[in-house]
Amino acid sequence: MRLTYTYDGDTIGAWRTLGGQPEQVKLRLAFIDAPEIAQGSWGLRARSYLRTLLYVNESIAVNFHGYDKYGRLLAEVLRTRDYGNLGLRLVLGGYAALWMCPSTQPAYHAAQAIAKAKRAGIWASPGLHQTPWLYR
């Protein structure tokens, strides 16, 4: 797959080939929730940070985890150049919160604990930017 667009701090667009046919898909980064763009500076910061981690047309590897209620593919997204996990980097940097669900991986809990302890990003001051699901 290849990145085509970064919509916000936890959603990207990508080209994939399925059955020999290319198609555009939306991927929602699994296990995390970044502030919404409409939430102001933290939503914009999350998107900007994600754009620094991955450039347009860059090759990505994905581990699929189903679909969300909007029909987006839920996936852990890795850069193929170094297999860096984008969701973990967003959480560790304080640009996204852990999305609480039964399948959340321990590494995400650890990354959020580190970000909170460092008061990184969204954890620097309290507010709805720490809980995007409540904002929606």
Predicted stretch roles:
Residues 1-136:
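Small beta-barrel nucleic-acid-binding modules, primarily SNase/OB-fold domains
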